[in-house]
From Swiss-Prot:
It is found in: Cytoplasm. One of its GO terms (biological process) is IMP metabolic process. Keywords: Cytoplasm, GTP-binding, Ligase, Magnesium, Metal-binding, Nucleotide-binding, Purine biosynthesis. Its EC number is 6.3.4.4. IMP binds at residues 14-17, 39-42, 130, 144, 225, 240, 304. Homodimer. Binds 1 Mg(2+) ion per subunit. Pathway: Purine metabolism; AMP biosynthesis via de novo pathway; AMP from IMP: step 1/2. The keyword Metal-binding applies. This is Adenylosuccinate synthetase.
Amino acid sequence: MSQNVVILGTQWGDEGKGKIVDLLTDKATMVVRYQGGHNAGHTLVIDGEKTVLHLIPSGILRKNVQCVIGNGVVLSPEALMEEMAMLEARHVPVADRLRISKACPLILPFHVALDQARERARGKEAIGTTGRGIGPAYEDKVARRGLRVGDLFDMKRFGEKLKELVDYHNFSLVEYYKADAIDFDTVLKQCEEFAEVLKPMVIDVPALLDKARKNGESIMFEGAQGTLLDIDHGTYPYVTSSNTTAGGVATGAGFGPRYIDYVLGIVKAYTTRVGSGPFPTELDCEVGQHLGEKGHEFGATTGRKRRTGWIDAVAMRRAVQINSISGFCLTKLDVLDGLEELKICIGYQLSDGSVTEHPPLSAEDYEVVEPIYETMPGWQQSTVGITEHKELPPEALAYIARIEALTGVPVDIISTGPDRKETIVLRHPFGQ
């Protein structure tokens, strides 16, 4: 029986989605990215070999899987070429396996320059963007002045539109941010070269997905970042510029919401965050340092050290509400091995002393909440590489059961290490 499955992060990103997508794609015929850009970083470890992907869907390493980049993704041709070259050097035939929407907005050099200039200008108030042009590209899309992949099919018209955009953004770069101007001729030449590579892969994605659905194929939708970074539902303004939630599938891939059968929420056994923004359960102590070191918590995209903290059931419940999550995949359980006790945030105390089980809507209010914790015993046994649920320590099983009780959602998959083999699957999202 065919199943259409969404896999997304339920925290602030970096939950371990790449491994799980790769693990589950043996049951899918198609993997689709529907939002974000190359600001995502999905790390795969297969038979000890590490692969980091930023733009191309994680299913690209599977021989019989077609990978798709939907219209909700802002596409950097330069980043795509680099990633294709890296994969093709390892004998992965990317051009044969990858298809790209004609409606993808393009990230061009002036978007990157603007992103970085703005972050410098903000100083201590910097949002913590990756500086890769994601936000400015989405701005051009919403302002209806952006260039899209489909525009590359008519280079004369493309050049005319590009000249207007270069002039428009150079004014801000030079006059306001005192940065260097972007050279039109250089960008145009690059785009002409990119066009020749991209054209064979460009397709009508909604039609492609609809045909696959009608043929009974199983489709996986791969989310980037996490629910709490969603432009509408995240800790605004410390968010990304796209809809990282399940609703992004309909708008970012052109796939009807009624056709989705299962939503898998990836949640780390603790919490991390990269960059600025509120983080109620953050740990500035030895435990936090331990989690960061043992969990190798450095951003796959930026290399920045991730902030670490206890798991937050309040934030998870919001993710459940927004995404209609069917089941959780709990990752990095093994990182908690050896801790004497664990804490779960079950509520927030507000500045007026009242208690809430719902996250605030503004970052300012989020910054001042105090987490209310429930303490549970840890375990001393190693869980690394365990593949049977019954082999987990009793304390680990109790921890998992408490997460399920607090969120009302079952933990269907448990990850006990970076390799795809180091996993416990209790209920398969594809029903197989």
